């Protein structure tokens, strides 16, 4: 595991975010672009990575330290990946828009796994590589297999079945990336507020 942390952090609180999904669907690129603003051109399969960065959230510009936990989607890491789940505040269930099978795996593998290890943790369904939905080469490859890119409506339907919000982005074009994390952080804050209210009622 490696760690990346911005110097001079002025965060008021900290949250842990874990990303899961098929290997090669774009999880690592999403985290790197968000934390550094640079898109990595070379694919390197993830074992486990941990980035720590700050995010400014809300109208009051609250600074939150966000621990970003990357996970490997390959089957050989199925026994190790659960080590990333404890104390998670929010989880991103990721798939690639140019790979319909990766969305199916969200339903068949990733959502059940997350529900098993983190049944009360908020989740966000994230469609990655949105730029490839209209990419000629990508759509042609899918066409030869009798497939088409995942539509927004298809992904939204899956998200609704999991009672989760859905958002799309393109790390390569750096579009929608910040919105993914703003949405995720918002869920952690709502979760904390809800827990506080319940605690007050109990007391």
UniProtKB/Swiss-Prot annotation:
GO terms under cellular component: cell cortex; cell division site; cytoplasmic side of plasma membrane; cytosol; division septum; plasma membrane
UniProt keyword annotation of Transferase present: no
A Pfam family per the record: Ras
Propeptide: 201-203
Motif (Effector region): 43-51
Annotated GO MF terms: GTP binding; GTPase activity; protein kinase binding
Keywords: Cell cycle, Cell division, GTP-binding, Lipoprotein, Membrane, Methylation, Nucleotide-binding, Prenylation
Reported effect, residue 23 to V: Cell lysis during separation
Binding residue positions for GTP: 21-28, 70-74
Compartments it resides in: Membrane
Effect of substituting residue 28 to N: No cell lysis
Presence of keyword Nuclease: no
CDD domains: Rho4_like
GO biological process, one term: small GTPase-mediated signal transduction
InterPro entries in the record: P-loop_NTPase, Small_GTP-bd, Small_GTPase, Small_GTPase_Rho
Purpose: Required for cell separation. Involved in the regulation of the septum degradation during cytokinesis and in the organization of F-actin patches and cytoplasmic microtubules.
UniProt-listed NCBIfam families: small_GTP
Protein name: GTP-binding protein rho4
Organism: Schizosaccharomyces pombe (strain 972 / ATCC 24843) (Fission yeast)
Lineage: Eukaryota, Fungi, Dikarya, Ascomycota, Taphrinomycotina
């Amino acid at each position: 595991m490696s760690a990346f942390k911005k110097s001079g952090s002025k965060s008021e609180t900290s949250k842990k975010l874990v990303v899961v999904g098929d290997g090669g669907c774009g999880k690592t690129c999403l985290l790197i672009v968000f934390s550094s603003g640079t898109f990595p051109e070379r694919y390197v399969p993830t074992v486990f990575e941990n980035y720590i960065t700050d995010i400014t959230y809300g109208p009051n510009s609250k600074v939150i330290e966000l621990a970003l936990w990357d996970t490997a989607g390959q089957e050989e890491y199925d026994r190790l990946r659960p080590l990333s789940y404890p104390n998670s505040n929010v989880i991103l269930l990721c798939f690639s828009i140019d790979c319909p099978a990766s969305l199916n795996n969200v339903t068949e593998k990733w959502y059940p796994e997350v529900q098993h290890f983190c049944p009360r943790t908020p989740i966000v369904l994230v469609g990655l590589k949105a730029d490839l939905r209209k990419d000629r080469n990508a759509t042609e490859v899918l066409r030869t297999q009798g497939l088409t890119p995942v539509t927004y409506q298809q992904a939204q339907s899956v998200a609704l079945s999991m009672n989760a919000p859905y958002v799309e982005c393109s790390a390569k074009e750096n579009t929608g990336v910040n919105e993914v994390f703003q949405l995720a952080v918002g869920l952690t804050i709502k979760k904390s507020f809800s827990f506080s209210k319940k605690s007050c009622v109990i007391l």
